[in-house]
Amino acid sequence: MMEDEYQLEYFKSEGLTRNICSSCGKAFWTRNPDRMVCGDAPCEPYQFIGNPIFRAKTVDEMREAYLSFFEKQGHTRIDRYPVAARWRDDIYLTIASIADFQPFVTSGVVPPPANPLTISQPCIRLNDLDSVGRSGRHLTCFEMMAHHAFNSDEKEIYWKDRTVELCDQLLTSLGANKEMVTYKEHPWIGGGNAGPSVEVLIGGLEVATLVFMSLGKQKTEKPPIELEGTPYYPMTLRIVDTGYGLERFVWASQGSPTIYDAVFPEMVSHVMQEAGFGHRLHDSDFIHILGENAKFAGLMDISGQRIFELRQKVAEKIGIPTDKLEKMIAPVESVYAIVDHTRCLSYMLGDCIVPSNAKDGYLARLVLRRTLRMMRELDLPDEKLGDLIERQMKIIGLSKFEQDPDVVMEIVDREVDKYRTTMERGARTVERLAQTYKKKCEKIPLDEIITLYDSHGIPPDMVKDLATSQGAVVDLPDDFYSRIANMHSESEQIQEKNPLFDYLDRLAHLPETRKLFYERPGSMEFEAKVLEIFDGQYVVLDQTLFYPEGGGQPGDTGLFLTPDGLTVRVCDTIKLGESILHRIDGGNVRKGDMIRGILDEDRRLSLMRHHTATHILLHAAKEVLGAHIHQAGAQKGEYSSRIDIRHYKHITPEELKKIEVVANRLVMANSSTSIAWEDRTDAEQKYGFCLYQGGVPPGSRIRVVKVAGDIEACAGTHCAHTGDIGTISIIRVEHVQDGVERLEFAAGIAAIQHKHHQEDLLNRSAEAFSVQVEALPATSKRFFDEWKEQRKEIEKLSSRISELESKNLETVDYNGISVLVKRLDLPNPELVKVATGISDKGGIAILVAGGETARVVVSSGQKGVKAGDVISTVCAVLGGKGGGKPTLAQGGGPDVSKIDDALAAGESFIKSALHV
């Protein structure tokens, strides 16, 4: 379908021919017309191990060589983006350099930061997680060196021929022989786009992919091209999307046995020494086997095949027993994986991802716990993880990370503690599950194992070991972690049907509503023309001061005054497309009327104060707690508001006080609030992606709000000066989910009202004790201490009473079994003590205590009489229910007038059970 796309003038001018690979059947371009294979693994094994392709370079040297080369070719070098894709709402991690420019640049909404540009972008992909360390080439975290050009009808930068020419020139500049290079045709599809691409292969290794993104799913007037059953249409932009693997270039320049030896020499050596394998680094036989293994391990694809089967193939090819290869290679593969994972965690945590059980935090915890599991296999202490991550951060360069390394270490230490707790608790959960499936004579399903990991954090290896010891059967796929990562790699897009969408077609002919709330934020009254009324309930004006619900801020309410002098209540305001709808409560508003709108001033001012205070609190929390603080949600209200923030531990009372003090100092500084519409690309380059605390707004221009150091893209209404807020009072902090803390607060008059409420509570409490407020802490402590002592005395007396009652109780003998059925108005613990005193001797007891409700305890020392059955009968008479074990059950009911009837029913049940 795309064959014509690869007929490049550059290929022809350089004398390349198009051949078909005898192994995979795919087309490729080569300078050697006699070449039969494409040069990709597994069609061709690695040729560069021990025989480097490029001049030897380190990671830093290779990166600089690449970026400098493209700068000399007219490209602008730009800084890397974070690995946490804060500017995207569809993915959590930056998976490619082009992801930096999606969706707004690639769709043509905004211009690129430079054109053409070059970048070396750290990326994280976890879809091959189980292959890392084993294949010799897979990484979770890698740098995608890239050059991008964005071509339009108005401006052509360069396209396919120049892209391939630049690739050839780069490879040659690094010392490669062009005659060895092949370009393999590979139609590319991803993220709703498509286009031709070529894989750049040399020495059996794919070192780059050159994608020519020119097709999209959005329908245009031009005819579509069908790919994999889906029609794709020519895009407005034609984008050069290249990806050169930095680590693969370094590997090919050194010819080392694996990519890990080339990229992480210091870390591999360090971890090998720590694990007791340091001597192997100087063992020539080991190095030889490692190199031979790496050549064929390039064929390994963990998905679809078992590790053991693949290991057998490699062992056979290099001529050693499988068990010997496994014993030699497996621990080293774990070392490689640990080194890779700790670099991945350095970027994740250094770029302010907080481990949790959701979103990007889930993925960080997944990698972290997998690392700990492998460390334990090598007998490396858990505490060593923090040291390894710190070493990686220093190698990369601490200045390249936003997060303070000390905070990273604290996060890691806490995650290690959580992992230990999970492992301890998980054992009991797994044992129960194993017993269940053992009784069924069934294998534990994979779904159950996934649930154990997803919901409880219990690793699959632990499940297998414990379940096997219990006699249950577990069959784990070798790509378990890759499957889990793929399940959580993308944001779930839930789009609820908005009933107002039915109005969109009717709104299409109307002009955009003029937003007076931006032009005159301090005004509370305005005049406007009624353009449309939907179903007598939703009014569209030509302009409005009413702010529509959005960004966690409720829509404004107020009044309309009609030309007839009638007052109409505005209950809510909603934005739909480019129009603003005012929901009215009855009233006679006519199309074409000029109405007067009046906002509920107190409510609007309160919402403005709370919205501005939200920005200030977020900034204060970041100042007190660390750079990782990121908004996880917010809701503004008239009387109180809340903001959810990502944090790795519970906020302490002392930290809460500091946040409140910092916030109020910012209020008292009375700084001006700056609001301006800016080009998205310019704003991102100036302020970073902390702009998108409240989500990613659409459009080429975004409304940037600067409040006391906090800078965000925000559509809400704000105070002109921080001093207009008055004061901020934090009401409470709540742990809403793992890794998320909620601050509830009040601002302005609402904060004063909250303070008054707190004072009222204190005064009423002081009055109850007949003391001054200042004496309340000491007095309440004294009363509490006295109450505890009195409770102990009461418990002693109750225990003594129950002992005396037990001695004086007369039981009834039914067929040689002592039965006690009686009302005893004692606390529950004493009722249980009396009842079990009877059942311990083989008897049966039914005891009921009165009060506001009836309380029942049944205890049975007879297998033929289950306490749970008896209590159901007794409690049913009382209008309640109960339950428990066969030997002891408790319950009750609200109808205390039926206690005697309930006792009689219970006794009758026992007599029947004992055949009396």
Swiss-Prot record:
Q: Cofactors per UniProt?
A: Zn(2+)
Alphabetized, the UniProt keywords read: Aminoacyl-tRNA synthetase, ATP-binding, Cytoplasm, Ligase, Metal-binding, Nucleotide-binding, Protein biosynthesis, RNA-binding, tRNA-binding, Zinc
* Cofactor mode of binding and number, as noted: Binds 1 zinc ion per subunit.
Tell me the enzyme class. Answer: ligase
Give the SUPFAM superfamilies listed for this entry.
Class II aaRS and biotin synthetases, Putative anticodon-binding domain of alanyl-tRNA synthetase (AlaRS), ThrRS/AlaRS common domain, Translation proteins
Protein source organism: Methanospirillum hungatei JF-1 (strain ATCC 27890 / DSM 864 / NBRC 100397 / JF-1)
Answer yes or no on keyword Zinc: yes
Sum up the protein's function in the record's words: Catalyzes the attachment of alanine to tRNA(Ala) in a two-step reaction: alanine is first activated by ATP to form Ala-AMP and then transferred to the acceptor end of tRNA(Ala). Also edits incorrectly charged Ser-tRNA(Ala) and Gly-tRNA(Ala) via its editing domain.
Q: Which PANTHER family match?
A: ALANINE--TRNA LIGASE, CYTOPLASMIC (PTHR11777:SF9), ALANYL-TRNA SYNTHETASE (PTHR11777)
Its UniProt entry gives the catalysed reaction(s) as: tRNA(Ala) + L-alanine + ATP = L-alanyl-tRNA(Ala) + AMP + diphosphate
A Pfam family cross-referenced in the UniProt record is DHHA1
One GO molecular-function entry: alanine-tRNA ligase activity
Protein name as catalogued: Alanine--tRNA ligase
Q: What is its EC number?
A: 6.1.1.7
Query: Gene encoding this chain?
Result: alaS
Q: Give me the Gene Ontology terms describing cellular component.
A: cytoplasm
**Positions bound to Zn(2+):** 611, 615, 714, 718
Q: Which family does it belong to?
A: Belongs to the class-II aminoacyl-tRNA synthetase family.
Subcellular location per UniProt equals: Cytoplasm
Q: What is the lineage of its organism?
A: Archaea, Methanobacteriati, Methanobacteriota, Stenosarchaea group, Methanomicrobia
> What SMART domains would the database entry show?
tRNA_SAD
